[in-house]
Amino acid sequence: MAPRQSQTAKRNKTQNKTRENESEVFLDSAARNLLENQPKLAAKSKVKKLSKLQVKKQQAKIRLYGAKNGKEYREEQLSIPDLNKAIVPGVKAKRGKKGKKFVDDNDSLTLNRLVKSINDKYDQVNESKLEKSRRLEEIRELKRQEMERKEQMKKDKLDGKKDELRSKASVARAARRKNAKARKADEVDEGENTVPKKKKVSFA
């Protein structure tokens, strides 16, 4: 059993402890960020620097097997559909740039309209009202022609579809008639082949 300590010894032991008086500024992170000299603020890097031997090994592996693609993607970048989410049938989410429309190379109407409307803000600097009205009229005319062409294309597409359906229906109708005629011919042949039986009467 250890000998009992006196009160004086205990007091001396506690009084002789060294105490650090640290300012509250350093303890509070928000206040510490405002200091001019920020002591020990940068966190240590978790990535260890490779030794020369490890670097050599790594380079040899790359030469042998090729470098790995170290790019990592987050979930939101991969456009994975969310689980437990109702998917509306028939609605397909658009991808790519919005409002991007491609013009055919031989589409002179659209190209002319675009050229005239793009030059609009540069030409209006020094042009008279008459010139401006003439140019705007040209743009309107080109737009009208474009609309007419679109309507005509729609109409042609619809007519083509109608003709296709009509031709399909006529082919099906002809096939049905042919089958019906063949069936009738078979029935007639079967009727000719069967000889009618003679009636017999027996007396008891």
UniProtKB/Swiss-Prot annotation:
Chain segments carrying region Disordered: 1-24, 142-204
InterPro entries xref list: Loc1 (IPR037650)
Location relative to the cell: Nucleus, Nucleolus
Compositional bias per record (Basic and acidic residues), positions renumbered to this chain: 142-167
Disulfide pattern: none
Entry keyword Transcription regulation: no
Ranges in a coiled coil: 118-169
The keyword Transport belongs to this UniProt entry's keyword annotation: yes
TM ranges: none
Recorded GO MF terms: mRNA binding
GO-annotated biological processes: intracellular mRNA localization; mRNA transport; ribosomal large subunit biogenesis
A GO-annotated cellular component: preribosome, large subunit precursor
UniProt keyword list: Coiled coil, mRNA transport, Nucleus, Ribosome biogenesis, Transport
Family (UniProt): Belongs to the LOC1 family.
Role summary: Required for efficient assembly and nuclear export of the 60S ribosomal subunit.
Quaternary organization: Component of the 66S pre-ribosomal particle.
Name of the protein described by the UniProt record: 60S ribosomal subunit assembly/export protein LOC1
Gene: LOC1
